[in-house]
Amino acid sequence: MTRRSILTAAFVLIAAALAPAALAAADPAAVINNLGNRALEVLGKSATPAQKAARFQELFREDFDVPGIARFVLGRYWKTATPEQQQEFVKLFEDYIALVYSAQLSAYSGEALKVTGSRPGPEGAIVASEIVRPTGGPPVKVEWHLTDRNGTYKISDVAVDGISMAVTQRSEFAAVIQRSGGQVQGLITQLREKTANSVPR
Protein backbone atom coordinates (compact mmCIF):
# COMPACT_ATOMS: atom_id res chain seq x y z
CA MET A 1 0.00 0.00 0.00
CA THR A 2 1.19 3.52 -0.71
CA ARG A 3 1.34 6.18 2.02
CA ARG A 4 -1.77 7.76 0.53
CA SER A 5 -3.73 4.51 0.54
CA ILE A 6 -2.63 3.77 4.11
CA LEU A 7 -3.68 7.24 5.15
CA THR A 8 -6.97 6.77 3.35
CA ALA A 9 -7.58 3.62 5.38
CA ALA A 10 -7.14 5.68 8.54
CA PHE A 11 -9.48 8.35 7.18
CA VAL A 12 -12.09 5.74 6.34
CA LEU A 13 -12.02 4.50 9.92
CA ILE A 14 -12.86 7.89 11.34
CA ALA A 15 -14.65 9.65 8.49
CA ALA A 16 -18.20 8.60 9.24
CA ALA A 17 -17.93 9.39 12.93
CA LEU A 18 -16.53 12.87 12.57
CA ALA A 19 -18.62 15.99 13.04
CA PRO A 20 -17.48 19.51 13.92
CA ALA A 21 -18.53 19.10 17.54
CA ALA A 22 -16.83 15.71 17.81
CA LEU A 23 -13.35 17.21 17.92
CA ALA A 24 -14.04 19.29 21.01
CA ALA A 25 -10.85 19.71 23.01
CA ALA A 26 -10.97 16.88 25.53
CA ASP A 27 -8.51 13.98 25.77
CA PRO A 28 -6.96 13.99 22.27
CA ALA A 29 -6.33 10.23 22.27
CA ALA A 30 -9.91 9.53 23.30
CA VAL A 31 -11.17 11.81 20.52
CA ILE A 32 -9.42 9.84 17.76
CA ASN A 33 -10.00 6.47 19.41
CA ASN A 34 -13.73 6.99 19.88
CA LEU A 35 -14.13 8.21 16.33
CA GLY A 36 -12.36 5.16 14.98
CA ASN A 37 -14.60 2.79 16.92
CA ARG A 38 -17.81 4.52 15.76
CA ALA A 39 -16.82 4.86 12.12
CA LEU A 40 -16.83 1.16 11.33
CA GLU A 41 -20.50 0.96 12.24
CA VAL A 42 -21.39 3.66 9.72
CA LEU A 43 -19.04 2.55 6.94
CA GLY A 44 -20.55 -0.92 6.71
CA LYS A 45 -21.48 -2.95 3.68
CA SER A 46 -24.55 -0.81 3.06
CA ALA A 47 -22.44 2.26 2.33
CA THR A 48 -21.85 2.81 -1.38
CA PRO A 49 -18.51 4.05 -2.73
CA ALA A 50 -20.15 7.39 -3.51
CA GLN A 51 -21.41 7.70 0.06
CA LYS A 52 -17.96 6.93 1.43
CA ALA A 53 -16.38 9.51 -0.87
CA ALA A 54 -18.92 12.13 0.16
CA ARG A 55 -18.23 11.41 3.84
CA PHE A 56 -14.51 11.81 3.28
CA GLN A 57 -15.01 15.15 1.58
CA GLU A 58 -17.14 16.29 4.50
CA LEU A 59 -14.47 15.12 6.90
CA PHE A 60 -11.72 17.13 5.28
CA ARG A 61 -13.75 20.28 4.84
CA GLU A 62 -15.16 20.37 8.36
CA ASP A 63 -12.49 18.88 10.59
CA PHE A 64 -9.12 19.72 9.08
CA ASP A 65 -7.45 23.11 9.42
CA VAL A 66 -7.75 23.67 5.68
CA PRO A 67 -6.62 27.34 5.61
CA GLY A 68 -3.62 26.58 7.82
CA ILE A 69 -2.60 23.53 5.81
CA ALA A 70 -3.05 25.44 2.55
CA ARG A 71 -0.72 28.20 3.73
CA PHE A 72 1.84 25.63 4.83
CA VAL A 73 1.85 23.61 1.61
CA LEU A 74 2.19 26.74 -0.50
CA GLY A 75 5.27 27.64 1.54
CA ARG A 76 7.16 30.77 0.59
CA TYR A 77 4.91 31.25 -2.41
CA TRP A 78 1.99 32.16 -0.13
CA LYS A 79 3.47 35.62 0.37
CA THR A 80 3.97 36.16 -3.36
CA ALA A 81 0.36 35.25 -4.18
CA THR A 82 -2.27 37.98 -4.40
CA PRO A 83 -5.20 37.88 -1.94
CA GLU A 84 -7.40 36.65 -4.77
CA GLN A 85 -4.95 33.87 -5.61
CA GLN A 86 -4.69 32.89 -1.95
CA GLN A 87 -8.45 32.62 -1.63
CA GLU A 88 -8.80 30.55 -4.79
CA PHE A 89 -5.90 28.31 -3.84
CA VAL A 90 -7.42 27.46 -0.45
CA LYS A 91 -10.67 26.38 -2.10
CA LEU A 92 -8.95 24.45 -4.89
CA PHE A 93 -6.62 22.78 -2.39
CA GLU A 94 -9.61 21.65 -0.35
CA ASP A 95 -11.25 20.16 -3.45
CA TYR A 96 -8.01 18.59 -4.68
CA ILE A 97 -7.24 16.77 -1.44
CA ALA A 98 -10.81 15.50 -1.19
CA LEU A 99 -10.57 14.26 -4.78
CA VAL A 100 -7.18 12.58 -4.37
CA TYR A 101 -7.98 10.69 -1.20
CA SER A 102 -11.57 9.78 -1.99
CA ALA A 103 -10.21 8.13 -5.14
CA GLN A 104 -8.14 5.86 -2.86
CA LEU A 105 -11.11 4.57 -0.86
CA SER A 106 -11.13 1.26 -2.69
CA ALA A 107 -7.74 0.50 -1.11
CA TYR A 108 -9.42 0.00 2.27
CA SER A 109 -9.53 -3.72 3.04
CA GLY A 110 -10.42 -4.12 6.69
CA GLU A 111 -7.54 -2.35 8.39
CA ALA A 112 -8.05 -1.34 12.02
CA LEU A 113 -6.98 1.90 13.70
CA LYS A 114 -5.43 1.54 17.16
CA VAL A 115 -4.59 4.64 19.21
CA THR A 116 -1.41 4.10 21.22
CA GLY A 117 -1.04 7.40 23.06
CA SER A 118 -0.81 11.17 22.86
CA ARG A 119 1.55 13.96 23.82
CA PRO A 120 1.51 17.76 23.76
CA GLY A 121 2.18 19.27 20.35
CA PRO A 122 3.39 22.71 19.25
CA GLU A 123 -0.17 24.03 18.91
CA GLY A 124 -2.27 21.34 20.55
CA ALA A 125 -1.56 17.62 20.67
CA ILE A 126 -0.11 14.74 18.71
CA VAL A 127 -2.03 11.46 18.78
CA ALA A 128 -0.05 8.32 17.97
CA SER A 129 -1.84 5.42 16.32
CA GLU A 130 -1.22 2.30 14.30
CA ILE A 131 -2.92 0.83 11.25
CA VAL A 132 -3.23 -2.91 11.82
CA ARG A 133 -3.60 -4.96 8.65
CA PRO A 134 -5.97 -7.93 8.62
CA THR A 135 -3.38 -9.96 6.70
CA GLY A 136 -0.79 -9.51 9.44
CA GLY A 137 2.63 -7.94 9.19
CA PRO A 138 4.06 -4.97 11.04
CA PRO A 139 1.60 -2.16 11.83
CA VAL A 140 1.91 1.20 10.11
CA LYS A 141 2.53 4.10 12.48
CA VAL A 142 0.28 7.12 11.94
CA GLU A 143 0.49 10.35 13.93
CA TRP A 144 -2.35 12.87 13.95
CA HIS A 145 -1.26 16.46 14.61
CA LEU A 146 -4.11 18.38 16.23
CA THR A 147 -4.33 22.15 16.60
CA ASP A 148 -6.48 23.62 19.36
CA ARG A 149 -8.66 26.30 17.78
CA ASN A 150 -10.53 28.01 20.61
CA GLY A 151 -11.36 24.78 22.39
CA THR A 152 -11.92 22.67 19.27
CA TYR A 153 -9.34 20.39 17.72
CA LYS A 154 -8.55 20.65 14.02
CA ILE A 155 -6.27 18.19 12.27
CA SER A 156 -3.31 20.08 10.83
CA ASP A 157 -1.13 17.22 9.57
CA VAL A 158 -0.91 13.44 9.43
CA ALA A 159 2.42 11.60 9.40
CA VAL A 160 2.60 8.05 8.03
CA ASP A 161 5.67 6.15 9.26
CA GLY A 162 7.27 9.48 10.08
CA ILE A 163 6.55 11.06 6.69
CA SER A 164 4.49 14.24 6.92
CA MET A 165 1.75 14.34 4.32
CA ALA A 166 1.74 18.16 4.48
CA VAL A 167 5.49 18.34 3.81
CA THR A 168 5.13 15.84 0.97
CA GLN A 169 2.34 17.90 -0.59
CA ARG A 170 4.37 21.09 -0.23
CA SER A 171 7.24 19.53 -2.16
CA GLU A 172 4.90 18.41 -4.94
CA PHE A 173 3.31 21.84 -5.25
CA ALA A 174 6.68 23.62 -5.16
CA ALA A 175 7.82 21.52 -8.12
CA VAL A 176 4.74 22.56 -10.10
CA ILE A 177 5.30 26.24 -9.31
CA GLN A 178 8.97 26.02 -10.26
CA ARG A 179 8.03 24.49 -13.61
CA SER A 180 5.67 27.45 -14.04
CA GLY A 181 8.47 29.97 -13.74
CA GLY A 182 7.88 30.54 -10.04
CA GLN A 183 4.32 31.70 -10.61
CA VAL A 184 1.59 30.51 -8.23
CA GLN A 185 -0.94 30.92 -11.04
CA GLY A 186 0.57 27.89 -12.76
CA LEU A 187 -0.34 25.69 -9.79
CA ILE A 188 -3.78 27.27 -9.49
CA THR A 189 -4.50 26.58 -13.15
CA GLN A 190 -3.43 22.95 -12.79
CA LEU A 191 -5.56 22.42 -9.68
CA ARG A 192 -8.51 24.08 -11.39
CA GLU A 193 -8.22 21.66 -14.31
CA LYS A 194 -7.86 18.60 -12.07
CA THR A 195 -10.82 19.42 -9.86
CA ALA A 196 -13.21 20.72 -12.51
CA ASN A 197 -16.50 18.82 -12.34
CA SER A 198 -14.88 16.25 -10.04
CA VAL A 199 -15.75 17.32 -6.49
CA PRO A 200 -19.35 17.96 -5.47
CA ARG A 201 -19.92 21.35 -3.86
Regions found by a protein language model. Give the residues of each.
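N-terminal export leaders
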Residues: R3-F11
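Low-complexity, intrinsically disordered terminal/linker segments enriched in charged
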Residues: D157-R201
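N-terminal signal peptide c-region/cleavage motif recognized by signal peptidases
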Residues: A19-A21
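Short beta-strand edge/turn micro-motifs at domain boundaries
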Residues: P139-V167
